[in-house]
Structures are given as structure tokens and as C-alpha cells.
């Protein structure tokens, strides 16, 4: 028997794309290379100035939240890699942190050290990727080439640790899957030196570059009031002068023990945001240099010990009958967290990334909601772009550092 489906009309089907001599409506993206394949903007122009901007999203929607409600808690971890795929370790950690808060797990100190190192390494890789792609959007191609070369060294380190370069899956609920490989920290120290040199090179190319500054200064200005009303976070918020960083406000892992600063901007424009990304690379280097000596002082366990939720070490599974049975139950049926709900915020490279989980005591979350920073920053384009020139739209979009894997989810 044939089924009848309701036909949905496109949202902008009846728009007349040309007005009078002074005004017109322009369709920007999703095919435009600077929309990164998934953003569509309906821009109303008066001359070359934007008087209205309407973002349309959803081209990368995959139902990630619903997938999480139909997978066991451990099964869902690799899916989080596909949210912000330029900083997948941050996604892994944010999800694991929410589940661990729900389970009230105590994470071994060595696992905390490794996690914090990976998070800051991941932050540097993400920031240098943003700077390279943003420079390419504006026309500074040489920066893209230098930055990508340095980024490769960081990806090599991630590959040495977890076997993957992009979708890392490097965090587990309760700890980390592996200890650091031999000589990995020596490679990390070399990478920090490479990052410092690359940063100096990029600053030499851009900071006093007249064209770069003209394209970014006083372009895409965000006021503190606008940032708060749109729920912005991360560098989009700190660029307005508001010093809010979840690593300081609600510290997790070892951030409470670490000495680092939260750089803020003065004007809230695209150039301020570029400067903050560069300054945050310095802070990540500073954090990792404090963590490296901490690693040697820690004991060997890298996973929490709780037989109700976490499998025993592999050696015990291979030699002890009870550990094998417990492992079988956790893999075949999944863990059953207590009834309750939790929201756990983290500071990802883009801003506040948090997972809300509502548990009914089943192996699957009853409700899983992802609070992704890029979603709010793309929505704010309807305010930020008004009054900008059409030629500056690409600069403004790029300076939000939005990734559509976490916008559409």
C-alpha cells in the first residue's frame, strides 16, 4: 500500500531575488568555498552593504543526538569525533566528562595528566588550523602553507598516541585507552618549539601587514551585549573584553592546579579574535610545559576502577573469571547509570561545549543534548553582518571559526 507524504516547500522558495535599482537579495552558499560547504546565507543588500542576513543551516544534519539515544554510552564515543572534526579530542572529552559526572567516577591522576595534555595539544592544532584557513579566505595563501606544515607535526603526535590523525577517539569514559608511548613527550617538546617558531613566522607575515589589518580591523564587531544575548562563548565572547573561560570558572581535570592567563580583546572585531587565537597558543604551550613534569610523578593506572561501569584491565580479563564476566556484561548490555540528569560544560577551542544527559537507569540515555558553540555563533551572523560590506562577509564568517559538524549535528 502506497504511503502519502507531506511535501515540504523550501524555506526561501518564493523569494524574489532582485528588487529595485538600489536593493537586491543575494544567495551566498552553500556551494561557495568560503561557506565551507554547509552554510547558506540569504543576504539583502543595499548597494554593497548588507542590510539583512538570514543564515540557513541543516545541510550536514545527521541526527547525532538521536543516535546517542539509541547507542550504549560507550558505543556513542566515536560518533562525537564527527561533531567538531577539527578538534575531535575536545568532543570525546566533553562527552566522557558528562557521563563521568553522572556516574560520579574518580579518574586516576595519570589519566588526568594525559587528558589535559591531549586537550591542549588538540587546542593548538585547532587554533593553527583556524589561522591558516582564515588567512586563506582573506587571501594570505603563504600563511596557510606554513601553518599546515606545523599542524602536521601535531597530527603526527596524535597519530603516534591513538592511531588516528583527525577522528582521534582518544578518550574513554573513566580515563584514557593507552599510556603515552615511549619518547612521546620528547616529540611533544620538539613540537612546542616548532609551534613557537611557526607563530613568530605568522606574526611576521600578518601583524604589520597593511592589507590583513584593513580586512580585519573594525570588521565583524561584536559588542558585549550582543555576545551575551546570543549566548556566545570562547574567543567570540572574550574578544569583547569579557574574561570568561570555563577552565577558570568551572575547572575540570587539572586546570585548577595550572598557571595560565585568559587573554581578552578590546574591540570585539575580527582582528581582536585573530590576536586572541595567537595568544591562546602561547597559553596552551605554557600549560603543557607544566604538565610534562607532572606525568613522571604519577602512578600507572589510566582507567577508573568501578566494576559496575568500567571494565577491568585487560590483564585481569585474560586471567580472572569474574573480570571476564563483568567485561562481557558491560560490552553486551552496556552500563546502567543511576537515574538522574547532568550538564557538564567544557572549554573547547571554539567555546563552551557541553553535553546534557538525562538517564532513566537504562543502557541508553533517555535524552542527550549537545550544546555546541558554533551553533550560537552562526546564528549571531544575522546581527554581526548587518552594516558590513559584501566583500567582508567572508572575513566575518571565517572569524567565527564555526565548524558545521557541530552546528547541524
Curated annotation (Swiss-Prot):
First and last residue of the signal peptide: none
Would you say which domain of life the source belongs to?
Answer: Bacteria
Keyword terms, alphabetized: Cell inner membrane, Cell membrane, Membrane, NAD, Quinone, Translocase, Transport, Ubiquinone
User: Topologically, how does it sit relative to the membrane?
Assistant: Peripheral membrane protein
Q: Membrane spanning segments where? A: none
Gene3D superfamilies listed in its UniProt record: Cytochrome-c3 Hydrogenase, chain B
The task this protein performs is described as: NDH-1 shuttles electrons from NADH, via FMN and iron-sulfur (Fe-S) centers, to quinones in the respiratory chain. The immediate electron acceptor for the enzyme in this species is believed to be ubiquinone. Couples the redox reaction to proton translocation (for every two electrons transferred, four hydrogen ions are translocated across the cytoplasmic membrane), and thus conserves the redox energy in a proton gradient.
What is stated as this protein's family in its record? Belongs to the complex I 49 kDa subunit family.
Task: Give the quaternary structure.
Answer: NDH-1 is composed of 14 different subunits. Subunits NuoB, C, D, E, F, and G constitute the peripheral sector of the complex.
Q: What is this protein called?
A: NADH-quinone oxidoreductase subunit D
Q: Taxonomic classification, please?
A: Bacteria, Pseudomonadati, Campylobacterota, Epsilonproteobacteria, Campylobacterales
